[in-house]
């Protein structure tokens, strides 16, 4: 996310990027040496960050303690750089979560914050999709998230001093207005290259299996369980191809076997990029079952291949998917969601003209999410606030 924003902003502006030293310095230095033309407007400044991996395993939120300390160092560096450069704009791009905004807003320059994420809660009715540990984790997160959105002092202070706030979901736009009293601009955190190749979804012949593609890390919040439970309810022939792998892979394989889906579901695991694209390009529909996410990059890969998307009507999917390119499932109850996945899959399997219409719509719709389109918005924001001290 961060690199895509920095590299595209640098096509239009001179950029001083303050970056974590340990994790990114070697990669960025090597890339700069190999592609000098791509970084000619970027000056990197690397700031070290203290890690405590053992403590983070015991108490994951401790990450923010060390991240906040890193932000103090980044701010001190920014103060010195500003004395030399006299920055026009300060833009806090990452991390996308709202909890730790850092201190760059204190520079007294127009402060652009975002795209912000992390506002989305996990629907309570979907905690049952998760294993016990996942259900406890996301249940606690829901409670803490509700408190932090309303009363988190760091976020509210940064929002108060922001010239402009970008955020990745429609729900976040509403909650920033409600809790922080600020208007935010909707901009999801991922995108497509403007010159991306458009590919067509293959035709589907009624009576043959509808090829479904699902991709994502096999972790609790991706909730493949929903789709697996939906497949036995389908009246039409289905064929599900599952990409990637992760901690939940074996559990999902066992569930698939228990549901009698051995001849329906194929778990491909990690495959070469070309093979993954072949699987996607030969599919008829793409399903997303995530119970918590901002916006997944795989959405735009699916659009690129002309795949209609079926997803839950929440997270970043609510704003990215519309009736021209996919189907959004309302979240009312666990059983209702499973039944809706099955119903919509059956519909697409028996209404090829509608599926083709959604396929064409997916290719057209993705043009709104290219990096060039995002830069038009960012450039307008920069132009509005440049040289206007706050």
Spans of features found by a protein language model:
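Nucleotide-activated donor-binding/catalytic signature segment of Leloir-type glycosyltransferases, i.e.
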Residues: 253-271
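Aromatic "clamp/platform" in nucleotide-sugar-dependent glycosyltransferases that forms part
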Residues: 291
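Conserved donor-binding/catalytic core segment of Leloir-type glycosyltransferases
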Residues: 116, 203-222, 228-231, 241
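Donor nucleotide-sugar binding/catalytic pocket of nucleotide-sugar-dependent glycosyltransferases
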Residues: 44, 113, 144-200, 207
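A short, well-ordered alpha-helix in the C-terminal region of glycosyltransferases
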Residues: 347, 354-368, 377-380, 384
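Short hydrophobic beta-strand element within catalytic cores of glycosyltransferases
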Residues: 308-311
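Short alpha-helical donor nucleotide-sugar binding micro-motif in glycosyltransferases
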Residues: 270, 278-283
